[in-house]
Amino acid sequence: MPDPYKLVDLFCGAGGMTYGFREAGFEPILAVEKEKDFAETYRRNFGDHVLAQDIADIVDAGGITCPADVVIGGPPCQGFSNLTGNRANDPRRAMWRFYMDVVESTQCKVFVVENVPNLLSSPEGKAIVRRAKQLGFHISEQSMGILRASDFGVPQNRRRAIIMASRLGPITLPQPVSNRMSVRQALKGVPRKPTATELRRTPAKGSDLHIARNPTPKSLERYRLIPPGGNRFDLQRAAPHLTPDCWIRKTEGGTDLFGRLLWDEPARCTIRCEFYKPEKGRYLHPSEDRPITHWEAARLQTFPDSFKWCGTKIRIAIQIGNAVPPMFAKHIGERVRQHLEEFGACPVPAHRVAMASGREAA
């Protein structure tokens, strides 16, 4: 069996991107995640090669010298997001610099950045491109763009910016696949009724995550008035007295708020960190009068039921919502592996990884 290409995942979170690349044939050798419970989730699923540290501290202390074939990651995206207003001075916007420092120090052949769509038009996105070219990477309009996860077998309309670059030669983004997955397919086998309101154990997996909130009578009234595919405007038409004043004053936009999913198409939403709050987006179950559960959100993100989650229910929700859907990552990984093979790239030898990993641990 050929030696696999070696992978480093920065800002790895729970490991959705690692999972997809591993499915595509890569071997994860190092990951970095500063949030301790997120890193523990990663460790439980992929092994002890995760560093629960701030990437800035690692780079300042000498950096990562472990050689790798590919570096992947999503520098914290809140500083670029439309949802967070004007964040010109947000320190998280500078995290790309440390990412590119690791790209340089690992001497990787390919790197992949995943982020919110605004990254591509931001000064930081343009700076990533400039730095990549300075380091000798091929990067072009064909290797970066906005992809929709539903075009890659993920049952949600998640739009993400992808930047790919290669030292070997021109690389292109993956092409959409034909097998679109519906909410019904994604939630097959999940009972309609949640089993609890709190986590019973941690690490939690599969049905352990089928937990629901205790809605107030007013919330239940609101849920019942939202038809399949409907949203807050249906509530306003049917029951103005149950509609918050701020929604009534906001006559445009916000069409996902208090939205209900449809069974037979991908979710018309992005699974975010507060998917258990329907006032935050289109998170009502297709036919039950409740928000989706953690288990259902993980399914819509294409995580397998065997995946182990660590932390409180709120922290697990953040991990689920922040994650790159593994199926999306798998298609990106397959494109990267195809590119490496087309150029006859040899994987970093295992003994070089072992030697460098020993130095990192020390």
Where on the chain are the PLM-derived regions?
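Class I S-adenosyl-L-methionine
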Residues: 60-68, 78-257
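Short alpha-helix immediately C-terminal to the canonical SAM-binding loop
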Residues: 36-40
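C-terminal target-recognition/interaction regions appended to catalytic cores
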Residues: 210-362
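Conserved acidic E/D residue at the C-terminus of a beta-strand in Rossmann-like folds
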Residues: 32-34, 114-115
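Conserved beta-strand positions in the Rossmann-like core of class I SAM-dependent methyltransferases
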Residues: 8, 29-30
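A short, Lys/Arg-enriched amphipathic alpha-helix followed by its capping loop at the start of a domain
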Residues: 20-27, 45
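Conserved proline-anchored active-site loop of SAM-dependent methyltransferases
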Residues: 7-21, 65-83, 111-116, 163-167, ...
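Conserved SAM-binding strand-loop segment of SAM-dependent methyltransferases
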Residues: 48-54
